[in-house]
């Protein structure tokens, strides 16, 4: 079983990508999807990446994190693929945990795991037991670095309307991807095992600071629950979860996300 780590980076982020690598092992490879806007940026690729036989760098002139992840998936060849950013850190034990989970859950097409911060603490609260992602517990959400897939060319792509670099919706691409995957009949589960260390903050954690994140919240709810199902949910969220800013402003932005999801045909 070959595990392939798909590292998505842009610009000078490629200089940090080498820090994601562990010591070489026969069953682990790395594919780096490197987005650039000017050919001069190709000089940013460090020699350490060029010298590793287990590393393959794919350079692509494009923008948007979802497009970058799609490019990485398109060029992947491993049996198991997992998504990484240039600030993720792995150990050999992490890879062993991933391989064991897929061997023990042969029916699973996708497994979502736990992530930890650099100091070893969980990045947030996680459920302590496994479950199928078609019926997740209340409050659960997934980060891209927690997703591992049994590679399949029929998997859906990440929706490029969502994620960093998109015009309107700054995040939510992971939740939409998992939703689309399950909707197409693939089996996805959660496994309470830690597989990666990463930064504690995410784009989604800026809900109170960025309107694009608030729009994303509404749009994701619309994709998952439909237009009419999203409306009571954003109202409830604004009433009980919004603090430190105008509830009406937050509700307005989330509603704009719901409307946008309908406009682009996602609900």
Where are these regions (language model features)?
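Acidic donor-binding segment of Leloir-type glycosyltransferases
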Residues: 17-59
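Short aromatic/hydrophobic "clamp" motif used to bind/position activated sugar donors
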Residues: 81
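Non-catalytic, C-terminal membrane-associated alpha-helical segments of glycosyltransferases
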Residues: 208-267
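A recurrent flexible, glycine/aromatic-enriched loop bordering the glycosyltransferase active site
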Residues: 119, 131-150, 162, 168-169
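Acidic donor-binding loop at a coil-to-helix junction in glycosyltransferase catalytic cores
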Residues: 163-179
